[in-house]
Amino acid sequence: MFYTHVLMSKRGPLAKIWLAAHWEKKLTKAHVFECNLEITIQKIISPKVKIALRTSGHLLLGVVRIYNRKAKYLLADCSEAFLKMKMTFRPGLVDLPKENFEAAYNTITLPEEFHDFEIYNINEIDISEPLAQNQSRPEEITLREEYSNDLLFQAGSFGDEPEILRRHSFFDDNILMNSSGLVVEHSSGSFAEEKSLFFDNGDGFGDEGAAGEMIDNLLQDESTFLEEAYLNKEVSLPPELPSSIMVEPGNSDDQCIPEDEEINEITLLSNEDEGFTLDPIDDLDIADRRRRKKRRLLVDPVKEISSKAMHRQLASFMDTLMVLDLAPPTQRLMMWKKRGGVDMLLSTATQDLINDELKMLFTKCFLSSDYKLAKLTLKESVRKEVGNQQIAEPSVMGEPNSHSELDQPQDWKDVTDESVGSFQENVNMNVNSEQDILGMISPAVEGLSSMNGSLAQENCPAELESSGSKQNTEAEKWNQRLFQTLNVLREFNKMGMQSFSLKKLCRNSDRKQAAAKFYTLLILKKHRAIELSQSVPYADIIATVGPMFYKM
């Protein structure tokens, strides 16, 4: 009943009315202004399709809401226009009193205030200094006009045939007879006379006389130079001269001038300070610049990827097996990773020590001095007792029945006898119970085991050199440890102990020492020197005396 094309279509005539009735927030200002209420009401009154009474009521609600919106917009526009007019025409402030219809000049004129800008004084600015820095001298930017010595003979005859000197009637006999007469007396008057001879052809511009004066001005200070230049100047005589003309023999040197000699063209400056020397131009650089770089066509030898290469790349899984070594996300984790290695864990401090001296002190003070001193004294005492004697222990790997008793080395016997003797003296004074005996035995056993371990480490290189075999060295080391443990157990048995606890024997020992003691007990069990028993798994192991306890 409510769904019709007239109402629901966006372009329908009643769509905006239906939207205003049911969804007023969706209605925009443009929709309100575009809606014509008169036409809309006519369509509601006489619709093309029959509309239900309830639908028409909804449409009337939409018409009322749109009309309300239009009234609000009109009221807002009128209020805004009224406010603007009220602000524009203010009678209390603008209207003048009846007594004075003319406003004062100051009230209607803005004051002309010229502020003093912070500018430099023009008189104090020195313009010559920056201009002088960027200004070049005329001699540096002007090409020099070099006047050669040929100007005297070629300037006036520019464009004429070079037949002036070839005319037979040009030179007088006196001139030809004396070749030095052309240059000996050079003055302004002589140049004027020669000018009248050589520059007889005028060009009609009226400057025929200016050429000589210009040359006189240029050459007025260089008369000596001109004399030397003209002495070296070759004067070509006409080939048609008669052979009857004679030349004075005294002036033969002046006449014999080589033809290959070139004129020394040098321009002298009036002020020597103005001259400067140009650097020579390298011809190779100019040639390299002019060379054009040849373009070569580069073509890839492989223009396409083969199917085998593509299959090989797809089947390759090596990139998935690579170990990704990514940097830590933070700087602190990076420092921890760098200093957390084994090489730096026990040699550097946890905090950053910038000073190198502090780092050296930390490494020196890492081990206690008491531990170092005790280790050194122990080594010295062992070296004195052992000396240079070689240690030779019989093998334990043979049958137990074939050995009545295995002999110990004399040096090890001395060490064990001294330690056990001191131990017996302490035990005989305070023997009351088995617990007291075990409490006093454990420190002696620990000291003995540590001493034996250090002795074995000290004598290891000597044994290696004497035996020459690694297997023999290991066997001798285990033989020493085996007999040391067996002698200690024998001493305990003589004091009245029938059973030995592995837990008490391994007290204050690290894992390596405890494993060595346990392995020694297993070897003694194999040779039937002791018997091992354990009540429950992971319980303490008890060792008792075996049949071969005193026969090994």
Swiss-Prot record:
Query: Would you identify the family this protein belongs to, as annotated?
Result: Belongs to the rad21 family.
Describe, from its UniProt entry, the tissues in which this protein is expressed. Answer: Specifically expressed in male and female gonads (at protein level).
**How is the subunit organization of this protein annotated in UniProt?**
Component of some meiotic cohesin complex composed of the SMC1 (SMC1A or SMC1B) and SMC3 heterodimer attached via their hinge domain, RAD21L which link them, and STAG3.
Whether Ribosomal protein counts among this entry's keywords is no
Asked if Nucleus is a keyword of the record, the answer is yes
Subcellular localization(s) per the UniProt record: Nucleus; Chromosome
- Protein's organism: Mus musculus
GO biological process annotations for this chain's record? double-strand break repair; double-strand break repair via homologous recombination; fertilization; homologous chromosome pairing at meiosis; meiotic attachment of telomere to nuclear envelope; seminiferous tubule development; sister chromatid cohesion; spermatogenesis
UniProt KW keywords: Chromosome, Chromosome partition, Meiosis, Nucleus
GO CC aspect terms: chromosome; condensed nuclear chromosome; lateral element; meiotic cohesin complex; nucleus
Which PANTHER family does this UniProt record tie to the protein? DOUBLE-STRAND-BREAK REPAIR PROTEIN RAD21-LIKE PROTEIN 1, SCC1 / RAD21 FAMILY MEMBER
Where is region (Disordered) located? 389-409
Which gene does this sequence derive from? Rad21l1
Annotated membrane-spanning segments are none
Species lineage, top-down? Answer: Eukaryota, Metazoa, Chordata, Craniata, Vertebrata
Q: What name goes with this protein?
A: Double-strand-break repair protein rad21-like protein 1
What is the recorded function of this protein according to its Swiss-Prot or TrEMBL entry? Answer: Meiosis-specific component of some cohesin complex required during the initial steps of prophase I in male meiosis. Probably required during early meiosis in males for separation of sister chromatids and homologous chromosomes. Replaces RAD21 in premeiotic S phase (during early stages of prophase I), while RAD21 reappears in later stages of prophase I. Involved in synaptonemal complex assembly, synapsis initiation and crossover recombination between homologous chromosomes during prophase I. Not required for meiosis in females in young mice, while it is required later as mice age.
Consequences of knocking out this gene? Male mice are sterile due to defects in chromosome synapsis at prophase I, leading to an arrest at a zygotene-like stage leading to total azoospermia. Females are fertile but develop an age-dependent sterility.
- Disulfide bond positions: none
InterPro entries per UniProt? NXP1_M-like, Rad21/Rec8-like, Rad21/Rec8_C_eu, Rad21_Rec8_N, ScpA-like_C, WH_DNA-bd_sf
